[in-house]
Amino acid sequence: MRLFRKKTKTKTSSRKSIIQNWFKFPSTEPNILNSSEIQSLSKISDPDSKNKILRTQARALSTNTSLTNGFFELLTSEILGEQGMVLDVSTGNKDLDEKIENSWFVWENRKNCCPYGLYDFEDLEEMVLIALYRDGEAFLHFVKSKDSLKIELIDADAIDNDYNNEEKNIKFGIKNEPNSIKPLEYYVRKSKQNLISIPASDIIHIKKTLIPQQRRGISKLASSIFDTYQKDSLKKAELDRSKISSSITGFFVKKEGNEYDDFGDEDDDSQKIEITDEASVGRMKLLEADLQPVFLPPYNPTNTEYFMKSTDREIARSLGISYSTYTGDLREVNYSSIRQGTISERRTFKRVQKFLIRKMHNEIFEKWLEFELLNRRLSPQEYNLIFHNFTFKPQGWEYIDPTKEVGANAKAIENGFKTRTEVLREKGIEVDTFLKDLEKDKEIIEKINEINKRKDDGTNQET
């Protein structure tokens, strides 16, 4: 019995040891060489406290580095396209749908939607998108009057990061409700002496947060700022070194056994040694016997290109795009790889499109619709009908391989896996617009047939 109990105890203790040692995290037990670097990862910093400096650094990179600047151009073209987000109202009442869509289109003009008459709605879309990625946040202010609604884009720098008041629960220029993360007021710094507060009900604060309690956004470039700076610094250093290496061909060295302090006596012209520092094609010059030229070896860095390419890959990954899209380098790309990379990018772009529509377009349209109701340009019944039957359509993309993808869509429709509406939606085409275009095509075909018929009749009469 004792032996049996001892064996049971041993099994239990071994089980406990196995369970206790089941999880092992190397980063929590670093060696002496890596301990200082690993411990630096444990230093906690408040994202809101880093918002201002990251925004400043990201703004500098967006104009100082060509690839980062090109990335922002890519964003606007791929996410917003040629027309931005297009309103689509589908209440079942065609007259009402056209009325609202036309009224919204008129309001999008810079004279109607901007309090300063400078920016139309597409300009606001572009600036909000760039601010969201570069600054990590964008602020839209509803400027209301009795009969109109206008939108003002507030610079993130104007929301005073340095304005804090613990008693009033104000941090980084934003006042929240007591014991809550719901904002009450935003404080805008107009000048050193002028600080105004705007109710949160009149502000759309679009941001991407890391933690729920975060008041300010963090730049999308935050994780790649240091890598971009290092790569750019190395590129400039290597360029400067190459310039110096190409400018300095070599040196003149004294031969062994010849000892003198200077190249001759300054007062005696006959003792001066003439050193040739110029060269021209087809000419040769005699070199003094006491001097020997030593040429510098050519400078050809070998690891620079690899470092820059690997860094660009990491930066592109952090931005959600492929290396070839980020750099424009298509040398190592084939159809399969570029197709896979493009599909992944488009998923990212679609998420951003839907995020913008949720946070910006829907909010603005609902507020605009409310003003239409208050000014009696809509009845309550029409308001409710439109409120539940509107959407914004983002742009679609061209096919990577039209033959294969059109064939795949045709088979999917034939087998019932897809609908024509779904295929049109993927292309960013509105169904109503598509049907109208089909009707126009039918009219064109009928006219062409009439013309051809007249030609045939005329030919038959002549014969």
Residue ranges of each PLM-predicted region?
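Extended, charged amphipathic alpha-helical segments
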Residues: 206-337, 341, 381-383
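Structured, mid-chain assembly/scaffold modules that mediate subunit interfaces
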Residues: 66-215, 412
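Activation/maturation switch segments at domain boundaries
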Residues: 2-5, 288-294, 300-301, 338-351, ...
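Short amphipathic alpha-helical coiled-coil/interface segments
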Residues: 100, 104, 308, 312, ...
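Short coil/turn segments at secondary-structure boundaries
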Residues: 91, 119-121, 142-145, 241-249, ...
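N-terminal-proximal low-complexity accessory segments that begin disordered
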Residues: 1-87, 462
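Short, Φ-rich (hydrophobic/aromatic) sequence segments
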Residues: 54-88, 124-132, 221-241, 356, ...
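C-terminal amphipathic alpha-helical
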Residues: 117-141, 300-400, 452, 456-463
